């Protein structure tokens, strides 16, 4: 299954349109949104709250393909503007035999791993920096990954 991940859009309609273009080009089966979708304090302070509605409209066009979790900036108002659920702190997905734990990153991250007794792929945003890492639990070695 082909997946696309995005995080920390923060109500930026321009970059949300870029995301939609990439989604339409790549045609993944699911778009996984890792939180902080609409809220942007700087947009509100400059009287550009309509960016929030524009961004919501762009995302709502893709609602049938979206799986989303709550970011630390997502609010009940954001949920009211979106036609898909965003208020879960995390979701677990099984994709092609792989266990994914998707979250925003403010609650679970490489420093505070999610509770699990099996191997999971932790996917999160929040840092605004793309990075990949492998973490071994105490009972694991690279040989049994």
Region spans (language model):
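Core catalytic region of metal-dependent phosphoesterases/phosphodiesterases
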Residues: 2-95
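Histidine-centered catalytic micro-motifs
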Residues: 9, 102-107, 120-130
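Pre-active-site segment of Zn-dependent metallo-hydrolases
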Residues: 21-22, 102-117
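Short active-site oxyanion
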Residues: 64-67, 99-100, 120-121
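Short loop/helix-cap segments at secondary-structure boundaries that form the rim of catalytic
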Residues: 77-82, 112-117, 131-133
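A generic structural signal for short beta-strands and their flanking turns/coil linkers
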Residues: 89, 118-120
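Conserved small/polar residues in nucleotide/adenosyl-binding loops
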Residues: 134-141
């Amino acid at each position: 299954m082909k997946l696309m991940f995005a995080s920390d859009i923060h109500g930026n309609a321009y970059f949300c349109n870029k995301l939609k273009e990439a989604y339409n080009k790549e045609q993944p089966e699911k778009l996984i949104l890792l939180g902080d979708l609409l809220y942007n304090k700087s947009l509100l302070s400059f009287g550009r709250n309509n960016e929030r509605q524009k961004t919501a409209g762009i995302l709502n066009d893709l609602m049938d393909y979206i799986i989303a979790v709550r970011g630390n900036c997502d609010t009940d108002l954001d949920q009211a503007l979106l036609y898909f659920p965003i208020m879960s702190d995390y979701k677990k997905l099984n994709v092609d035999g792989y266990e994914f734990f998707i979250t925003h990153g403010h609650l679970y991250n490489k420093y505070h791993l999610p509770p699990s007794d099996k191997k999971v792929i932790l996917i999160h945003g929040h840092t605004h920096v793309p990075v990949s890492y492998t973490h071994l639990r105490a009972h694991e070695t690279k040989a049994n990954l």
